[in-house]
Curated annotation (Swiss-Prot):
Residue positions assigned to the propeptide: 1-10
Record-level Gene Ontology MF annotations: metalloendopeptidase activity
Protein name (database record): Germination protease
Organism lineage string: Bacteria, Bacillati, Bacillota, Clostridia, Thermoanaerobacterales
Signal peptide, first to last residue: none
Protein's organism: Caldanaerobacter subterraneus subsp. tengcongensis (strain DSM 15242 / JCM 11007 / NBRC 100824 / MB4) (Thermoanaerobacter tengcongensis)
Role: Initiates the rapid degradation of small, acid-soluble proteins during spore germination.
C-alpha cells in the first residue's frame, strides 16, 4: 500500500499517478484497451521501482471500466473475458494444474465481502476429478476454493490458515480475491487490479496482516483486487486541493489571502485534515450507499473471468450445471 501524507491506495496505477508525468526509475507503464475498457500495465522492474512505488517487483495490471456502474451486461462479459485472458497470461497453467481460489475478507461486512462472494460462484472441480474421473475426464481442470474468514472471526491469521491448506492440497497456483482501497471515488467497483506479487489481507483499510505471497506459500500467487472504499483523508485532501485552486484563481495575486493560499504546504493541509477528522483520521473510510449491489455485480464479473480462465474446455451451460 502507498501512503503519502496519510493518503492511502492499494492500486499501483494510482501510485504511479502520484508522480504526475515524471518518469520513475525502475518502473515501466503501458496502456491499451477497447471500447469502454482501459487496461494499464505497470511493471516494477527493480529496487528503485520498489522504493518509489512502495510495492514489490512484479506485474500490476489494471482494468478500468466505468460503465460497470450502469449494469451493462455486454460490458460485464467483455470485462470478464479480458480478466480471463490476463489470468491465463500470468498463470501459464498446464491442463493438469490444480488451482486454489481464496476469497479473502469478512463476509459480515459488505465492502469487505468481495472475496467470499466471488468464491461462492467459482466452478469447483477437485472433488469431481478425484471421485468421478471417468465421467469428467480431461475437459475440466482441478479447482478448489474457500473463504478463510478474518482474524477477528477465527482468531487465526489468514496466511496461517492458507499455508495449512496449501501444504495439504498442494495446488500449483493460488488465486486470491480481496477488497482494496482507492484514492478516487470513480474507481470504486469499476476497477480490477491483477498482480503476481501476492497481497497483505486487510491492507485496504490499514489493517495489515501477514502477507500472502509465493515466498510464504511456496507456490505462485495471483492477487485480484477491487477498490470498494476510499479513505476519508483522501476525500478531505482532494477537497482542500480543489478549494485552494479555485480560490487562488479568483483572488488577486497581490492580496494577502492569495499569498496565504499559495504558501500553504502539504503538511499544513494534512494538519487541517487531522484536526477535522480527529480522532478517526487513520480509521475512517467511505463507501457508496449502494455497495451491496456493486459488490454483487462485480463479484459475478470476477468469478466469471476466473471460471473462463480456469475451465476453457467447458461451455457456459456446463459451468452453470456445476455451479448450481
Amino acid at each position: 500500500m502507498i501512503i503519502v501524507l496519510g493518503i492511502r491506495t492499494d492500486l499501483a496505477l494510482e501510485a504511479r499517478e502520484l508522480y504526475k508525468e515524471r518518469e520513475i526509475p525502475g518502473v515501466s507503464i503501458r496502456e491499451e484497451g477497447e471500447e469502454g475498457i482501459k487496461i494499464t500495465r505497470v511493471k516494477i522492474l527493480d529496487e528503485r521501482g520498489e522504493k518509489a512505488m512502495g510495492k514489490p517487483v512484479g506485474d500490476y495490471i489494471t482494468i478500468e471500466a466505468p460503465g460497470l456502474l450502469e449494469r451493462d451486461l455486454d460490458l460485464e462479459e467483455r470485462v470478464a473475458k479480458v480478466l480471463a485472458n490476463i489470468i491465463s497470461e500470468l498463470a501459464q497453467l498446464k491442463k493438469d494444474s490444480h488451482v486454489l481460489v481464496v476469497g479473502l475478507g469478512n463476509w459480515n461486512v459488505t465492502p469487505d465481502a468481495l472475496g467470499p462472494r466471488v468464491v461462492s460462484n467459482i466452478v469447483v472441480t477437485r472433488h469431481l476429478k478425484e471421485y468421478a474421473p471417468l465421467q469428467f475426464g480431461d475437459e475440466i481442470r482441478s479447482v478448489s476454493a474457500f473463504s478463510p474468514g478474518v482474524l477477528g472471526i477465527t482468531g487465526i491469521e489468514t496466511a496461517e490458515i492458507l499455508k495449512g491448506v496449501v501444504d495439504r492440497v498442494k495446488p500449483d497456483l493460488v488465486i486470491t480475491i480481496d477488497a482494496l482501497a482507492s484514492r478516487r471515488l470513480e474507481r470504486l467497483s469499476t476497477t480490477i487490479q491483477i498482480s503476481n506479487t501476492g497481497i497483505s489481507p486487510g491492507s485496504g483499510v490499514g489493517n495489515r496482516r501477514l502477507s500472502i505471497t509465493s515466498e510464504s506459500l511456496g507456490v505462485p500467487v495471483i492477487a485480484i483486487g477491487v477498490p470498494t472504499v476510499v479513505d476519508a483523508v483522501t476525500i478531505a485532501h482532494d477537497t482542500i486541493e480543489y478549494l485552494v485552486k479555485e480560490l487562488s484563481e479568483q483572488t488577486s495575486k497581490e492580496s494577502v489571502f492569495y499569498k496565504v493560499l499559495e504558501n500553504m504546504n502539504k503538511q499544513e493541509k494534512y494538519s487541517l485534515i487531522e484536526e477535522v477528522l480527529s480522532p478517526y483520521v487513520q480509521n475512517l473510510v467511505v463507501t457508496p450507499k449502494e455497495i451491496d449491489l456493486l459488490i454483487k455485480n462485480i463479484a459475478l464479473v470476477i468469478s466469471r473471468g476466473i471460471n473462463l480462465a480456469l475451465q476453457p474446455g467447458l461451455t457456459e451451460k456446463e459451468m452453470n450445471q456445476l455451479l448450481h
